Amino acid sequence: MHKFLALGLLPYLLGLLNSTRLTFIGNDESDTAIALTQIVRGLQQSSLAILALPSLALSDGVCQKERNVYLDDFLQRLHRSNYKSVVFSQTELFFQHIEENLQGANECISLILDEPNQLLNSLHDRHLGHRLSLFIFYWGARWPPSSRVIRFREPLRVVVVTRPRKKAFRIYYNQARPCSDSQLQLVNWYDGDNLGLQRIPLLPTALSVYANFKGRTFRVPVFHSPPWFWVTYCNNSFEEDEEFNSLDSIEKRKVRVTGGRDHRLLMLLSKHMNFRFKYIEAPGRTQGSMRSEDGKDSNDSFTGGIGLLQSGQADFFLGDVGLSWERRKAIEFSFFTLADSGAFATHAPRRLNEALAIMRPFKQDIWPHLILTIIFSGPIFYGIIALPYIWRRRWANSDVEHLGELYIHMTYLKEITPRLLKLKPRTVLSAHQMPHQLFQKCIWFTLRLFLKQSCNELHNGYRAKFLTIVYWIAATYVLADVYSAQLTSQFARPAREPPINTLQRLQAAMIHDGYRLYVEKESSSLEMLENGTELFRQLYALMRQQVINDPQGFFIDSVEAGIKLIAEGGEDKAVLGGRETLFFNVQQYGSNNFQLSQKLYTRYSAVAVQIGCPFLGSLNNVLMQLFESGILDKMTAAEYAKQYQEVEATRIYKGSVQAKNSEAYSRTESYDSTVISPLNLRMLQGAFIALGVGSLAAGVILLLEIVFIKLDQARLWMLCSRLQWIRYDRKV
């Protein structure tokens, strides 16, 4: 009977011992101080934060007095080891100290002389659990706390120090195993009678612990985003409900991943690091963005797959997850898996009207110079001819005097009246006679020369001949030959409109041509537009003005949907996204039907994990090895090659089907004709239009000349009739 009572009270006594801390009397305080000093030194850090609060379980004054003595002794020994320490008696100041260290990415080690239950909730609520923060709880009892009573969940790093006997201390660590069960495991111990700590450093490194996950299962959000993930949704219910973000509701939505670059990457990581993964549907089937409540953005809450990471319902997230400052506040990123750039896609430059082909060789910047050359050529030619006549003028004695209409020769008068008439000779400026209407002739001569019309030599001077040769060479070998060569190239390769490949051209097209810009909802490209400066902010304002009734009408479910929108005839649409994603989706519909812009900005994609993720270092090591060995690039190229093979197979299949169908064959033939087309008279219709316009203008001028001649004849006839009447009246 007593034996059974003893067995029944044994669990109770163990629990009581487990929840009770030992008190120190006599030399126990110095032994404890020495042990804790050696334990802290085993961490190989130079600073320590100490939180010393009155314990609720040990509230008697004796223990409080002994603890003060212990704390003083511990600080004295710690400072002898050249350690920096700061002691807090208020939890708020202690939490602020940890937050400041985390913001500066500094490792912070804390020694807490209080019960864990009173601080764990605050540590989790304030997101102070991080791989850079280590919390040492001096438990003081023989056994560590039971996992049913206290659970130290990841990413919180906790060390619990127990005292099984005098001068002996055991160190338990919650991240000694990679299985994420938050159970404490013995990793080291201290024996004051022997050599002190068993091993240094005190704790196993995260790289060694998380190098092998030993079959641990991770939850990975996923949504359809080729070429990164090809997803088939087994449950098509897409409505939002109150329990949509709960883990149970998400796991019920089954998804099936059929391929993708990041799917292959995840399989390779799982094989190398020995873990399993389970795909869950990302809420909203998006990466995630900041929630908007009452028009105000909440920086502490995200939607989509990032929201699952932030709430701890997922372990990591792949699929072209772009890095941004806003996202770094909620999650962390690994070493980048893709170095990409931002870009946008539009339709391919359309073929211009062939009727204007004869005018296109002279671009807009050439026409002013050509017109000015033709305008000033005539006056320059006139100046070259007229200048010699002006230079050869000289003063000579004038022999002729004018008296009204009479001309008097002074030499003759001197001969018939010698010594009677004394006149002084008058000097005048004499010159050779300039050709009649020289300026008009020079203008028409240059015009006929540039227009390749027949014309005679205007002047026989060597200067005029030299300039005529220069004009003829310019008109024949420069203008005519260059024009002919460019016109031939225009006929061989039909001209197309200027491509929209810069942000400035896209902005001009949205303002003047009514283009619409689309972006994937809750993506990093959308964040770039919302938080960007200059042109990005202006483009975002233009996007919101596209659809007045629907301010969010510029959202698309995926980049693939946007490319499909352009392929179905959206000639006035553009899609913004990652260049690699755009390039991959463009191949599905034919790259010759789309135009990719220049690189707008550099963007990086990486594996997203929870803040303070303990295995981020191990994951980075594997990703860096894959990057340095070129495996990531090979995986991307393999995904592209696979897509090309599928596209080619689809085209061959469609070609065989269209060969049997005359209508489909005619469509294929018309499509091929837009790529390479032979020279035909349609390309020369511009010349016939110009000839028709010239003939019409000549006919109009001829009619006007006839009309004006008849009017002049009528006026002359009326004038003659009036003169005859006047003569008749005078005679009468």
UniProtKB/Swiss-Prot annotation:
SUPFAM superfamilies (alphabetical): Periplasmic binding protein-like II
Tissue note: In the antenna, detected in sacculus neurons which innervate the first and second chambers (at protein level).
Extracellular side of membrane: 20-369, 487-688
Disruption phenotype: Response of sacculus neurons to changes in humidity is abolished and consequently larvae fail to move towards their preferred humidity.
Primary localisation category: membrane
UniProt subcellular location: Cell membrane
GO MF terms, alphabetically ordered: ligand-gated monoatomic ion channel activity
GO CC terms of this entry: membrane; plasma membrane
Annotated Pfam families: Lig_chan
InterPro entries named among the record's database cross-references: Insect_Ionotropic_Sensory_Rcpt, Iontro_rcpt_C
Topology of the protein relative to the lipid bilayer: Multi-pass membrane protein
Annotated signal sequence range: 1-19
Positions of glycan attachment: N18, N235, N299, N531
TM region positions: 370-390, 466-486, 689-709
Gene3D superfamilies reported in the protein's UniProt record: 1.10.287.70, Periplasmic binding protein-like II
Spans within the Cytoplasmic topological domain: 391-465, 710-732
Record key words, sorted: Behavior, Cell membrane, Glycoprotein, Ion channel, Ion transport, Ligand-gated ion channel, Membrane, Receptor, Sensory transduction, Signal, Transmembrane, Transmembrane helix, Transport
GO BP annotations listed: detection of chemical stimulus involved in sensory perception
Function of the molecule: Integral part of a neural sensory system in the antenna that provides the neural basis for the response to environmental changes in humidity (hygrosensation). Together with Ir25a and Ir93a, mediates the response of the hygrosensory sacculus neurons to changes in relative humidity and is required for dry detection behavior.
PANTHER family, per the entry: IONOTROPIC RECEPTOR 20A-RELATED (PTHR42643), IONOTROPIC RECEPTOR 40A-RELATED (PTHR42643:SF30)
Family of the protein in this entry: Belongs to the glutamate-gated ion channel (TC 1.A.10.1) family.
Protein name in the entry: Ionotropic receptor 40a
Originating organism: Drosophila melanogaster (Fruit fly)
